[in-house]
Amino acid sequence: MSISIGALVLVMVASSSQDDKIQTLQKLVHELREDVAELKNQKNETWLNQQRAEEIRSLVLEVLSDADTRYSMRGDGVLAGYDGGAYLMSLDENWKLKINGQLQVRWLYNNADRQASQRGFELRRTKVIFSGYVVDPSWTYKIAATWGRAGGSNTEDAWIAKKFDNNQWIRAGQFKAWFLRENIISSSKQLAANGSMVNNAFTYGWVQGVSTGWNNEDVNLFVQFTDGPWSFNTNALGPSTNAWIARAEFKFGDAGWSDFGYLTSKIGAKDGLLIGVAYENYNTDTAGGFEYGNANADESYGWTIDASLRGDGWNLFGYVVETTGKDTVTGFEQDSSGWLIQGGFMVNNNYELFVQYQNGEINNAVFATGSSEMSAFRIGINYWPVTGSNNLKWTTDVAWSHDSLADGGTVTGNGSADWTGTGNGWRQDILNGDGQMLLRTQLQLLF
C-alpha cells in the first residue's frame, strides 16, 4: 500500500514537472512566432523601399532621356532669361531675340479760351518690340509694331544693321531720323508725358532709307539719306524725294552714351555733358511739298544745336532749331524757329520734379486765327513706384500757353503752323483766343 502511494506521488510529481516544461515551450513558441512576424514585416518594408527606389530611379532616367531628346532637337541649345527685356539666345551667342513692350495709358484735360473744354482717356502708345542679332552679334535688327489710338496697327522701326570692327556701322530700312535730339530720345525715356510743340513742328519722325555712322567713347557721327520727313510705311513708286541729315555729338564727363539715352537722371547717376549739332536738307517732286518746319515746302534746309547736362539726381536739357522751307513753284519762302529748355530734380529715389519752357516763331506769318508765335510753360512730377526700376512710371504735368495757337496754312505764303496735335494734347485756338491749359496724367509700363 505504501509502495503504491509512493509511486503515485512520483507520477504526480513527474506530471507536474512536464506541464511546466510544456508551458515554457508554448511560451517560447509564441515568442518565436512574434519574432518571425516582425522579421517578415521588416523584410516586406525593405522590399517596398527597394521597389520605390527602383521606380524613382526609372522615372529620373526617363525624364533625363526626354530632356536630352528635346535638347538634341534644339540644335546647339537655347539660353533664356531677362536682361532689359525677355530674351532667347543660342549657346554660342550668335543668335539672339529680345522682346520688349511699351504701354502708355493717359488721361488729359484741355481748357481753351472761347472753346468747350475737352477731356478723356487714351492709349497713347502700345508697342511690342523685337530686336537682337543673327549669324553673329555684328548683324543686328529691330522691328517695332504699334497699335494706334483709333485702331489698326502700324510699324515704326524695321531695319537691319551691320557693325564693323572700326566702330563704324551701316543701317537700312525704317528708323528714327536723327535731327532733333528730343525726338531721338525714346518716348519711354522723356521727362514730360509727351514731346513738345517745338518737336511736333520740326521733327522728321520715322523715315525710310539708309544711314551710317562712327563713334568712340567721346564722339558720335551720323549721316542719313532718306525719303524725307515722316516717310515711314510708304512704297518706292511715287514722287521722288532726296533728304539728308548729318549729326555730330560730343560727350564729356563720366556718363556713358547709354546714360544720355534718358532725359531723366536718377540719384547716383554719373555726371556728364553732351553737345549735339545737326543739319537737315530735302527736296521733293511731291506736289505742294511736305508740311515740315511750319511750312508747306518742296525744299527745306535747317540746323539745330542741343545740350544735355546730367548729374547725381538732376538734369538740364535745351536746344534751338531753325529751318527755311521753300515753295519753288510760287517762290514763297518761310523761316521758322523754336527753342526749349527743361530741367528735373530727384526729391528722393522715387519722385522727380521738373519744369519746361518752350517758344517758337513763324516769321512774318499771318493766320486767319492764331498768332505767328508760340510759348508755353510746364511743371510736372514723375513717380517710379519701384525704387531702382524704370518698368513702371507715372507722370503728371500741367502747362499753360501764352499765345493764340495757330494751326494750318497762312493767309498768304507757304507758312503752315504745326505746333498742335492730338499726340501732345494742344488744340488750335479759335477766334484768336489766347489762353489754353493742358493737364496730362499718364501711367507707363515697360517690359
Q: Over which residues does each language-model region extend?
A:
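Outer membrane beta-barrel
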Residues: 79-231, 237-274, 334-365, 372-377, ...
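Outer-membrane beta-barrel pore domains
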Residues: 47, 113-115, 159-161, 267-447
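Short linear motifs centered on Gly/Pro in flexible linkers and helix caps
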Residues: 15-16, 31, 190, 393, ...
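Intrinsic disorder/low-complexity segments
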Residues: 1, 12-14, 413
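Sec-dependent N-terminal signal peptides
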Residues: 1-7
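N-terminal periplasmic/intermembrane-space "pro-region" immediately following the signal or transit peptide
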Residues: 7-102, 254-260, 442, 447
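General helical structural elements
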Residues: 25, 37, 56, 61, ...
